[in-house]
């Protein structure tokens, strides 16, 4: 059996919202495998499906620039929120986002080689690092193209902690911005149910079945309950089926259709997604309770 470390318990607790002892028990039962431990907690009804935002832990800001039929969404990282709020950092972010929308590089390496008045974009980033005393880095970006009849919708939340960019066919810019606001707030994983892989469907169906059996439901109605729960789950993670944040009486797809539009694409950045940040005090708390 794998040794369960306090850091693992801390990570699972943060991801699932479970108590320390429940998290430790799940890790023991799954031999330290984080994904299996999460499934264990869900089967026991202790945790719900993890959202991407559960893993947010870095500083910086995101921004969006639109240049004709091209838009760019960019994340720039710093070591502290203090530097992220500084004018040199915010000025650099605006410059980086604008240049990426204009030059359309294929990756971060190409973006860093974009020519500027100071040499390259990488030189500008180094200069800002020197000004602020902290490492500043271009973490990621996405360049999005649209057709002439499409609309971009861009929305920044909390000054750029979350950025959402959508493309709608047919609808106007105001409708597209409304959908971008929804994406920022609700954080869908997929555009439609057709975008969810069969592997993901099978995985979720198995989790819901185990959860339902653990609740003691009669076996003859288990499959019906499972399909109902799976249907509800899909309506929560697919943009088209989600209740529209500004009018819960209609779905996002219905709202866009009412404006003579059609959903085409969306992308959402949350600063620090997928980066774990050291949490010394919390780790000590876990260690104390495990001993």
From Swiss-Prot:
<dbReference type="InterPro" id="IPR001816">
    <property type="entry name" value="Transl_elong_EFTs/EF1B"/>
</dbReference>
<feature type="region of interest" description="Involved in Mg(2+) ion dislocation from EF-Tu">
    <location>
        <begin position="80"/>
        <end position="83"/>
    </location>
</feature>
<protein>
    <recommendedName>
        <fullName>Elongation factor Ts</fullName>
    </recommendedName>
</protein>
<dbReference type="InterPro" id="IPR018101">
    <property type="entry name" value="Transl_elong_Ts_CS"/>
</dbReference>
<keyword id="KW-0963">Cytoplasm</keyword>
<comment type="similarity">
    <text>Belongs to the EF-Ts family.</text>
</comment>
<dbReference type="InterPro" id="IPR014039">
    <property type="entry name" value="Transl_elong_EFTs/EF1B_dimer"/>
</dbReference>
<dbReference type="InterPro" id="IPR036402">
    <property type="entry name" value="EF-Ts_dimer_sf"/>
</dbReference>
<keyword id="KW-0251">Elongation factor</keyword>
<dbReference type="GO" id="GO:0003746">
    <property type="term" value="F:translation elongation factor activity"/>
</dbReference>
<dbReference type="Pfam" id="PF00889">
    <property type="entry name" value="EF_TS"/>
</dbReference>
<dbReference type="GO" id="GO:0005737">
    <property type="term" value="C:cytoplasm"/>
</dbReference>
<comment type="function">
    <text>Associates with the EF-Tu.GDP complex and induces the exchange of GDP to GTP. It remains bound to the aminoacyl-tRNA.EF-Tu.GTP complex up to the GTP hydrolysis stage on the ribosome.</text>
</comment>
<dbReference type="InterPro" id="IPR009060">
    <property type="entry name" value="UBA-like_sf"/>
</dbReference>
<keyword id="KW-0648">Protein biosynthesis</keyword>
